[in-house]
């Protein structure tokens, strides 16, 4: 390989100057030498041609010397007159006196008809020379800009060649071929996703022994699409396939196809498949497929779309007129909803493998993999961490342990302690503590009652998730947080569970009106969450009293993703009015349930608010003891204690695991870490 590289370098540098970085310098030097020579020739043609030397004098001074009969000899060439005087003459210039005997001057443009008669009358020796007939000055002045332009272009091209970026290499594929010996990722490094790994193992088996399947009349899928939320390990699975497969593995990002030049994307697709066919059987992996695979016809413009041209070429290569045997295409995306239907049909991407958020057992396995090279103290229970992190993706868990390791180093620990992991969870999910934010007594009391309202309602209602921690310590954008941890992963939401959760979210606003007889802006995010959830109950889930067995919801398509410009609702104005009334009724019922619960447990409500004002953080166990009247069991929370929490603001019908509920008091936006469930709330 080294000999081949050396040969290529010699070929690049032999025929032309500037075949490499040093050649580029030589080429630049040659250009400057040529430009300097042309400039000198032009200057000579403009100032020097016809003037052999002498003091430059005016024509009037020349006539004066001629009238004084002091001119001995002149040489005329065109308009230039060179001559010598019989005796030295003087002239003043800028206050200086200059003596001269040889001189140079030029005839005026209108000529001098008496000059020759005057020269002959005084016996001056006159010599004439023919003027050059070729206009060198004009030619050089015209060629100089053109030559300079070519010189700049020459340097630019040589520089591109020295960097391996020839003029036409922009059309070549940017897919990288992974070496099996260099790629050390295997399926053992991928925890969870067992069904996805099994599907991919089947692809690898076909590549290793295709006759086993062909004998049964089976054909390998032409395309495999990995679909799932961000951070669930889709790209990691592809790297594992590269490490396991005994076949060439080409990897490219969807954005690598697009450039500023027209036609580059389609050309790169052709080149990529051409390379893969030469080494077939082979695997091509396209990461972030949605960057080139979006629905055609998207947007409001009617012009040609370079992305669509690239997509059309990809469709043709996957299942076009020519057979594409021996090449399997893998792709990954977290936006399958915007992919073109022609791309996802059978015959192109035959299989869609869903890589979902990990379950509790999968989270435990993922934590064990990421903790391999991290020293853990004896008090760290990875299974407990997995239980308390519902809704976390693999990337979230990796980041959690990394933040814990950084905190352990900051605290001077020899190993990662459980307190480091708890602090890391609070930091990752709620942000840093805002130590510089100081609340006055009135705001602190209002915030304490607001969070106490969430916590008491959450601890009393039977279907609500257990309260884990309540704090009024400002973190990130949140001024206060009530954390709830589900007892298990939850994929479906019951009607009574959603109603209890709505009441918990309304607990903060109910507390404000009960204690202070007013409302604050801190409940802004609470109200948004309630409206969003109540609307889904009525329109999508059939949980309204008036619309129990009908879905009125409709996906609102995005025109820039290929959907229609406008979509009208499919129900009447009267029905829309009833929907609004139903949403209002659900919200009011949730608020009233929260008020009734706080009135019923007003003593525990006041005690919890006082504890928050004094301690700023209260554990969920202490909240439950207050509700049950077991005040003797109440202890003080250490300041290092934390709990896993996440804000859920997706859709409950996504069938994703339940997550920790975070109810935030926030005067700004109340937004926390989005994790993907519908029933989280923030205030």
Curated annotation (Swiss-Prot):
The keyword Transport does not apply. Binds 1 zinc ion per subunit. Its cofactor is Zn(2+). Coiled coil: none annotated. One of its GO terms (cellular component) is plasma membrane. Residues 1-21, 627-683 are annotated as: Disordered. It is an enzyme of class 3 (hydrolase). Residues 1-12 have a biased composition (Polar residues). This is ATP-dependent zinc metalloprotease FtsH 2. The gene is ftsH2.
